Regions:
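Hydrophobic alpha-helical scaffolding
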Residues: 6, 142, 189-190, 299-302
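N-terminal Rossmann-like NAD(P) cofactor-binding subdomain of oxidoreductases
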Residues: 1-178, 325-328
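C-terminal helical cap and adjacent loop that interface with cofactors, partners, or active-site loops
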Residues: 259-348
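Solvent-exposed amphipathic alpha-helical surface segments
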Residues: 23, 159, 251, 316-323
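C-terminal substrate-binding/catalytic lobe of Rossmann-fold NAD(P)-dependent oxidoreductases
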Residues: 14-18, 22-68, 163-166, 170-173, ...
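A generic structural signal for alpha-helix starts
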Residues: 11, 147, 232-235, 304
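Active-site catalytic microenvironments for nucleophilic, acid-base chemistry
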Residues: 155-159, 229, 315
């Protein structure tokens, strides 16, 4: 049985822990905690072993938390570590633990792909380059926005690539996650140099892509507005929707009033953590004018990358084919069932 450790217990770490407990081929060693707070007891109550920095073990135990050992102890036992630590700490963990201990590691989208702080030489998107991660020891899982763009752009290129001249995408990003204690300010902010464009072109280099990013005062998902320029008349609306009909992790919805509607429906349908873990094309917003096609889709920021991280475990540890990995991922996350439920709830 393979041993996996989750280094962090925030938005991503807590969700991955839920998923991994369902996989009988994997033993979840435990999770890492860096701050003494109520989330520690939450993890213990769920049956997870908690590991903390060696220098903080006494402080945690003085608060009556049952600590199983140091983070280094857990990493030493592991076959693979999912680094779900605070953005920017991945390179520190790689230098301190993963590289010296020769451990495979999955990093999240906030870590650097290039430069002196690069943690890996590849950004993963299961729709595009799953096979290339099979022999890798270190991989970055693309961020929720980058993952969502890949799920839309790759099928379009495969079907209409010769006719597409350029992609322009405006990322309307949520300010904070639902569980976040971060203040949601009454402001709209812009990113002068969003990383999403370069990140996506890392695994789809042929895309003639231009990305702008805004941050809006909401906790309810991201919304992407994508404009495609064609060499001539674009395909019909029906043809575009047919392109995505059978795509894994892409739902086609109609008449949702906003991202909050979808999130609330996910909670109502009792999806784990209230996540859909997919992108949702809003068919009523699909527009064609002359040589231009406009697609709007919402992106589940909290759940999007969780199945993607799980896919990386299938490749890096279990060496499964993409088809086998998708089948196993659907078994754990019920992606097809969730897609069907959402499309039924938001239909014509």
């Amino acid at each position: 049985m393979y041993q996996v450790f989750i280094n962090g217990y925030g938005i991503i770490g807590s969700r991955l822990a839920t998923a991994l407990t369902r996989d009988k081929s994997i033993n979840l060693i435990g999770i890492a905690k860096y701050s003494v707070d109520e989330k520690t007891q939450e993890a213990i109550n769920k049956g997870y072993k908690v590991f903390v920095p060696r220098k903080l073990i006494k402080e945690f135990r003085n608060k009556n938390y049952e600590i199983s050992g140091s983070i280094e102890d857990a990493i030493t036992q592991s076959d693979l570590v999912i680094d779900a630590s605070t953005e920017g700490n991945g390179i520190k963990n790689k230098r301190k633990y993963y590289h010296p201990l020769k451990k495979k590691a999955i990093f999240q989208g906030g870590e650097d792909r290039y430069g002196r702080n690069s943690v890996a030489d590849i950004i993963h998107n299961s729709r595009v380059n799953y096979v290339k991660t099979l022999e890798k020891d270190s991989v970055i899982q693309g961020s929720c926005n980058v993952t969502g763009m890949g799920k839309i752009i790759q099928p379009l290129i495969e079907n209409y690539g010769q006719s597409i001249k350029r992609f322009d995408v405006v990322l309307v990003r949520r300010w904070a996650d639902l569980e976040d204690k971060k203040e949601v300010r009454d402001s709209i902010e812009w990113d002068k140099n969003p990383h999403h464009q370069d990140d996506l072109k890392d695994f789809i280099p042929s895309a003639n892509l231009y990305v702008d990013a805004l941050k809006v005062p909401s906790r309810m998902m991201h919304l992407h507005q994508m404009t495609l320029r064609f060499d001539g008349r674009p395909p019909s609306k029906d043809d575009i929707l047919d392109t995505f009909k059978n795509e894994f992790g892409v739902a086609i919805l109609n008449n949702a009033k906003g991202t909050g509607d979808i999130r609330k429906k996910a909670v109502e349908l009792r999806f784990d953590h209230g996540d859909t873990s997919m992108v949702h094309i809003h068919s009523e917003l699909l527009k064609i004018q002359e040589d231009t096609l406009k697609i709007s889709y919402s992106d589940d920021q909290t759940g999007m990358v969780i199945p993607e991280n799980y896919m990386l475990i299938q490749s890096m540890l279990l060496k499964r084919s993409r088809a086998e990995a998708l089948k196993q991922t659907d078994k754990i996350f019920s992606m097809k069932k969730k897609k069907k439920s959402l499309e039924s709830e938001f239909q014509n």
